[in-house]
Amino acid sequence: PKYIMGEAMSIGENYDAAKMQALELAKQNLAGQIQTEVTALVENTVANKQLSQEQAASVTQSIMASKNLISQSIGRTIPVMEVYRTLFNKNKEVLVRIAYNSNMAKEAAKKIVREDLEKKGDKLHKDLDKLLGW
């Protein structure tokens, strides 16, 4: 798909606070989806015997640790839907759905995983680049 979608709901005393929190949670949702997709790529590469179990464990560990970094690196998202309602206690409940370009998402994840592996001094990032076509 060209875009991946993330959504989240949040409740706050005022609309702006609830919306900001919902947007951050939606970005976390996107980051989780990206993380899952990259992990699946790595597992598929292991299944095809192109990476050893130890190498895959190292990459997967980097991917799991990078969810917050992926979320932070997500650039401008496209708001697809935003609805709110006032609850009985006067708090605002906001639901947002956002879209993000799939290619940009994958690039962000690749960059973060590559940097993490380089920091560890792991030469695996070069093998991974070749195997996954990064």
Where are these regions (language model features)?
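Domain-level marker for long, solvent-exposed, non-transmembrane regions
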Residues: P1-W134
